[in-house]
């Protein structure tokens, strides 16, 4: 697929950056903001939507309730009754509020006079109460990008959701350790015009947040949501982009998806089709008997569980289900996503992809005959329990009919390959209502004074300071954008100048990336481990060269750090000199025959023996001494 002209199709992108704050307490109670795997009890809940003050039910909440899932909550030792929704929330945390105020000021946003907490209905189980508490801190503002001002719409404080442990068709298990951790949400205006600009703006906002020195790091602590639309399409919400580098691909693919859905709408009009024609000719036939001897593993597996096989006729839709919307995803995939989300069924096949999946040409012809499929028609085969098939057929018809309208209003989930899938309908205005258990909090002089310590430095000033520490411009830029910037500054204060800032920065960024490139599990390389190794270098317990070797072994084996370190005890000069003399003696004939390469030969062999136990500069010095 050729890339679209984004100015021509009217691409608009807005960002929602969600970042956990590194505070002592949660947003509405005094519990700590640390995560714990252990738990001492668990709760079980079922959640259901309720009518708003205007008598409306939010469509997204209704969608989640229809799944009928049970929610199980593990209660860790660092949790209280607030997280369990058995005690009213406490007043808003001052530290979190002060950080949000500081960020607001840095983004030229206008602070509200009083902070009012609202309830946002969420009944996917991620909140025990059935809603998420959120509060607007400031309005308006901007961030610069290549001379253009990207508007800020709102900056809000909200509580993070419970941490999902497992998800099955009937229940979801959550841990309450994450529920209530303060989260700052920065929403930009839809001023972003290209996929690459979106990545730059997200990077700059993330950088600004890190420069406060009060945000959490690691997987799941920051999340980018995207709002994407093109001319003729609709604003689509894309949730849960974890990696910045995925942002351009996700936007490109969403723009393409909306563009292709609009093309499908045009194609259906060219075919003189309309909703009434498709609806009136829509046919459902039970094909279970016809597939009783099939070789399709998917269908046979369902038949063994007493499932049924339905065939659906869709008039005039030949070629539509196979229409590619983005890489590896077609219109048929979109329909299947709706069925999976609403009916919990995964076995859907359409005529544009058959014969395939063990379904033979003869079986396809049999289905065409039974459903009375004409040359321009299409059909779908769906398998599952009868009670779910009834929901699935209604879902399929609804999604097919929406093709005549173009792009549906959806919330979609970001996938690791840069594509997206249907998640749920977009929530409506019936989702929000006031929190009656928390009094308003005025942004007074005390909060403004507290916020001063968190106002982030300008990136240009911070970059200059990093270069003044001796870092190259490239390494300084890498460190400026690093999630470990605050750790770097802490280690420099403790261990430089004996351990150079350049070595510390290289270890935190370049060495860790090297370990990852070698297949290492870098999740085991914690801040504590990195500091411990820098401290060992400072105390001359290991050499600088040993750090990379130790981290690589730690990330590629199950060996404990203290066991690995034992193998890298530094050699003293006498021991090192002995090894060098022995190596020269062992390779005497070779270096006599290759005098011009003698140094390289001995250097290679010595380093193989002493790697990680001796400083390479010292090795070079002693080899030169003994080679003459």
From Swiss-Prot:
InterPro entries: Asn/Gln-tRNA_amidoTrfase_suB/E (IPR017959), Asn/Gln-tRNA_Trfase_suB/E_cat (IPR006075), Asn/Gln_amidotransferase (IPR018027), Asn/Gln_tRNA_amidoTrase-B-like (IPR003789), GAD-like_sf (IPR004115), GAD_dom (IPR029351), GatB_C_1 (IPR042114), GatB_Yqey_C_2 (IPR023168). The gene is gatE. This is Glutamyl-tRNA(Gln) amidotransferase subunit E. Heterodimer of GatD and GatE. It catalyses: L-glutamyl-tRNA(Gln) + L-glutamine + ATP + H2O = L-glutaminyl-tRNA(Gln) + L-glutamate + ADP + phosphate + H(+). Its EC number is 6.3.5.-. One of its GO terms (cellular component) is cytoplasm. GO terms for molecular function: aminoacyl-tRNA ligase activity; ATP binding; glutaminyl-tRNA synthase (glutamine-hydrolyzing) activity. NCBIfam families: gatE_arch (TIGR00134), PRK04028.1 (NF003107). Keywords: ATP-binding, Ligase, Nucleotide-binding, Protein biosynthesis. Allows the formation of correctly charged Gln-tRNA(Gln) through the transamidation of misacylated Glu-tRNA(Gln) in organisms which lack glutaminyl-tRNA synthetase. The reaction takes place in the presence of glutamine and ATP through an activated gamma-phospho-Glu-tRNA(Gln). The GatDE system is specific for glutamate and does not act on aspartate. HAMAP family: GatE (MF_00588). GO terms for biological process: glutaminyl-tRNAGln biosynthesis via transamidation; translation. Belongs to the GatB/GatE family. GatE subfamily. The keyword Ligase applies. The lineage of its organism: Archaea, Thermoproteota, Thermoprotei, Sulfolobales, Sulfolobaceae. It comes from the Archaea.
